[in-house]
């Protein structure tokens, strides 16, 4: 009897293990099968480590990449270069994470049929990018390193996300032997993976914080003598700006005024608003995640805190994330999260269609409206409306000091205040010098291309 009981327990244990294993397998199959199929080793989806199951087009239907058999890029050399960091190269040095993320959708994978496409034509992925805008940005950057990003802050569609340096995947240069520095960081998607010292574009963050938490800030004035001292240390401006308000301090990008504004806001509030606005958070969309920024004022002296509110100290921002912050201001405190893939089809079947997601409210409507008015004033009084082809641009420039004898990075961020062209943007030109002088001509060409594309849709 004891022997029978013992055997019954052993059989029961084996049965429990078997059932548990089956349940685990079924759970993994239901939740992870798509990832298994699109794993780079899958012969059903990949050819020689490259996804091989369809075509990728831009928003206008231009074929950017045919991956039905081998990798065939656009017939246009400029387009091949301007879209390289999203489509990847043949050897896998530059990944196409967003494309790979939807490989199963392109292949027509489902849990019942597996990888199956009755049409025999493969899938088609449509990106929100415009080849025309990408090429305009590439031309405007003129060989300089950096990134240009533009997205629709109402829908989330990314029209432009250019990274330079780049190269033609059909005419690959000898990068390993290059000693000129021309291709330094060429495999990096700067829009997603880079972080930059923001310089004065960060003053928008400080301005929004001051508007929200400093009583009567609109009645405050700040006097700039060219330097604002903290004992033996000081914050400096290129010239004495005299007496300024918050609005004119932003327009003149007055460091000394913002040092005084920083004192009114205070450390605790600055940390709070940086977190609330999300400007240093990573951002995820379409299977990609951006680099995290940095705002660290722990154990900092007053002068270092002042510089942090000016966009220096150890501040770092990611271009994609900061562009989204600009979009939230344009949207009255709520923006759209960006996305790159508009839709995916397998044969005649729509297997994926993007939907707009919002950032949630990051600031009040009143604060956003005030910041927007200030940024509009910047363009009207400093940068010049004539640069933007009749578009109502709101912006802030930045010249981020790098130290070590390096030339400053040029930054420019903002948005278009127009129902027909709801675009937020960021331009970064590495070692480009002054922000507005360098970036405005780039942005002017890119926004003109965006306008042309949107008018044609």
Please report, for each region that a protein language model flagged, where it lies by residue.
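Periplasmic/cell-envelope proteins involved in peptidoglycan metabolism and beta-lactam response
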Residues: 1-176, 186, 195, 268-276, ...
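Beta-lactam-recognizing serine transpeptidase/beta-lactamase-like catalytic domain environment
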Residues: 60, 154-199, 205-431, 456-457
């Amino acid at each position: 009897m004891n022997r029978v009981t013992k055997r019954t327990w052993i059989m029961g244990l084996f049965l429990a293990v078997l059932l548990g294993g089956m349940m685990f397998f079924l759970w993994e199959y239901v939740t992870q099968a798509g990832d298994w199929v699109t794993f780079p080793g899958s012969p059903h989806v990949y050819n020689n480590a490259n996804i091989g199951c369809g075509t990728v087009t831009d928003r206008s239907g231009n074929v950017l990449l045919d991956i039905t058999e081998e990798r065939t890029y656009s017939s246009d050399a400029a387009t091949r270069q301007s879209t390289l960091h999203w489509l990847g190269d043949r050897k896998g040095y530059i990944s196409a994470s967003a494309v790979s993320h939807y490989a199963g959708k392109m292949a027509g994978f489902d849990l019942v049929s597996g990888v199956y496409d009755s049409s025999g034509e493969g899938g088609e992925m449509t990106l929100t990018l415009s080849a025309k805008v990408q090429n305009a940005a590439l031309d405007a950057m003129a060989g300089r390193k950096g990134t240009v990003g533009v997205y629709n802050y109402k829908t989330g569609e990314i029209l432009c996300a250019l990274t330079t340096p780049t190269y033609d995947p059909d005419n690959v240069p000898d990068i390993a032997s290059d000693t000129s520095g021309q291709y330094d960081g060429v495999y990096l998607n700067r829009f997603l993976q880079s972080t930059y010292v923001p310089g004065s574009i960060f003053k928008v963050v400080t301005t929004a914080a001051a508007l929200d938490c400093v009583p009567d800030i609109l009645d405050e004035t700040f006097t700039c003598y060219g330097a604002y001292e903290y004992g033996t240390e000081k914050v400096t401006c290129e010239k004495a700006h005299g007496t300024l308000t918050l609005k004119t301090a932003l327009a003149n990008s007055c460091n000394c005024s913002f040092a005084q504004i920083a004192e009114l806001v205070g450390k605790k509030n600055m940390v709070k608003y940086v977190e609330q606005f999300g400007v240093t958070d990573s951002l995820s969309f379409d299977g990609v995640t951006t680099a995290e920024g940095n705002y660290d004022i722990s154990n900092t002296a007053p002068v270092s805190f002042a510089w942090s509110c000016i966009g220096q100290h150890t501040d770092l921002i990611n271009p994609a994330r900061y562009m989204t912050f600009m979009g939230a201001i344009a949207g009255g405190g709520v923006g759209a999260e960006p996305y790159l893939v508009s839709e995916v089809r397998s044969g005649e079947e729509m297997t994926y269609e993007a939907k707009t997601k919002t950032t949630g409210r990051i600031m009040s409507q009143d604060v956003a409206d005030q910041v927007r008015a200030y940024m509009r004033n910047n363009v009207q009084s400093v940068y010049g409306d004539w640069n933007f082809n009749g578009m109502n641009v709101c912006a802030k420039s930045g010249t981020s000091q790098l130290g070590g004898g390096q030339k400053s990075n040029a930054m420019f961020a903002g948005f278009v205040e127009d129902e027909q062209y709801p675009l937020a943007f960021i331009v970064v030109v590495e070692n480009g010098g002054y922000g507005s002088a360098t970036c405005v001509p780039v942005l002017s060409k890119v926004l003109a291309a965006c306008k042309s594309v949107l008018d044609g849709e």
